[in-house]
Amino acid sequence: MSIFPKKLIKGKDDFTTFHMRICNNSDEDIIGQIKYKVILPDGNSIEMDIDRTEKVDANSELNEYDNFYIKAEYTIGRYFVEGRFIWDGMDILSDTNKDDFFDVITKEGE
């Protein structure tokens, strides 16, 4: 997964976008759900269940984009994001699917 933009200015920027790329190298279609876990700077976390079913055709790739909105009560700091694709009760993304992060800052240049 990847995130853009990586830096958000609190009070100016409203959201960042998570990009999830899922490759299906098997000969069968898979159907599952994307889930995100956002770990806040204070150590608490938010579970984002997108609540939609994704179908990845056999021997193909799926690219999905989801927005994460920055609420007024969110603090300045680094937010870590774990992206998962759940199929048949299992997380099927490989170790190469790296978690990512973004920063909420007070002003440009921080």
Where are these regions (language model features)?
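Short, surface-exposed loop/turn segments at beta-strand-coil junctions that are enriched for proline
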Residues: 69-75
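Primarily secretory-pathway and cell-envelope proteins
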Residues: 1-56, 60, 66, 80-86, ...
